[in-house]
């Protein structure tokens, strides 16, 4: 909307100052126009100098600039790449820091465009043919002041931001009368913001996780599913269609992140006491692949699940390595029923970690329903984490154009596995099952580990006898907590996280002290090394208090942050749904309070 500006409303001194500035601007513009005119006249002079006159006689071969005769063998001249004229060696100008050259006219024409800024207007005219010439506010004021005292000034329009396509098109029609560079910028900003909102909704739908179930017909299973946080729900068909676009937008630059310290590819050699099942196996790790990322997002085909798979499990305490020997499969379904074709391979995960670092897979066996792999897949995992992990062994078909087809899976809770039993290391046959939408609620979920250091700082002694009598010494305590880092977190599909830590100390009077660490972006194993300090607490208060630490993944485009895991210390220790961790957290909290002014290192399991 235009605003009316009346110069007569200003005082005489103010009006003189405004006009003086405008006239000075007009003087600068006239000086600039004179400089541009001289540059163009010099360029025109060079062109006239090289033009041939009808009153003079020229040889057949001569320089197009200085009209000097050119020889047949020596001083033959060369053709300019800009104007395609043959010029002599003296009429060439070499460009700075390059071996390329131009003739004097082409070089001067290039300089004129650079010094006058014509290259910008040429590029703008080429990209935006309908854009008009830019007019400055000073020129408009001077022209209108000479005619009328009232001036109409149009302020710059803020960038539009609308939800629906209809409102976006109407906004573009309102901006149609504006000319110049502002129109192109606003159109570009509108398209970018609209696309970003669509991309954020689709990407957030892709990150919804589906927890899988251990296939045991004698056990009762629960139902828990993490819902998407977008405004509208999408079906499986639209999810499959939007996945390649999202991967193309978010994986143009391959993120560089350190390998997972819990799950490593390079493991020490296994113990010689292994059974013969593991002696002949080959270790085969997997790399980051977009196709595996798509399968975790649900972008795959399903076949009629049939058949069985034979594998064995062994854990080496000395090297802290879990070994899965994939033997063979039988009676698999066809990955491509029409072509009667099946190219199977096996892929494993240690749930809940579905990242690319936690993936292991075998080689692909071509054209067989009864493949034999004889490969050993290894994980580097601590013994304390085995009770909270589930082994997922799935069989896939590699189709045309790297299309994956799901052939079946087996999920085994490692908490129920007896690694000390020698008979448990023998290879067993397991029936393949279809993908389930549920998971067992009675199995504690391990979402990684959080390394912290804690210290209770208490004064050495009271400075005055009155302080000890009044109890001021007990209230001057300080709880210091250093969040070192985390590992084995449930990362995104690209293998990275934008993680941060929140801390909440709940005192006996229900007062809550909250702190937060900075965000570390694009790191799978973040190392914050950030200090949390809680002042004005006593040892007696902390014995009845609870410290809760939560790790979060910062969302993009203003969506809700994703909770990665939590750990509790104190009188009400233990994460929700994991009662076994309560006694351990209370013991660690007691160690901190019983050793004041000393650092205590702890590794907290996130649930």
From Swiss-Prot:
PROSITE patterns: C2, RABBD
Compositionally biased intervals (Polar residues): 230-241
Keyword Repeat: yes
Membrane topology according to the record: Peripheral membrane protein
Gene3D superfamilies from the UniProt entry: C2 domain (2.60.40.150), Zinc/RING finger domain, C3HC4 (zinc finger) (3.30.40.10)
InterPro entries, sorted: C2_dom, C2_domain_sf, FYVE_2, Rab_BD, SYTL1-5_C2B, Znf_FYVE_PHD, Znf_RING/FYVE/PHD
Tissue distribution of the protein: Highly expressed in spleen and lung. Detected at lower levels in heart and testis.
Compositional bias ranges of the Basic and acidic residues kind: 248-259
Record-linked SMART domains: C2
Region annotated Disordered, chain positions: 221-279
PANTHER family: BITESIZE, ISOFORM I
Subunit structure: Monomer. Binds NRXN1. Binds RAB27A that has been activated by GTP-binding via its N-terminus.
UniProt protein name: Synaptotagmin-like protein 3
Originating species: Mus musculus (Mouse)
Taxonomic lineage: Eukaryota, Metazoa, Chordata, Craniata, Vertebrata
Record gene name: Sytl3
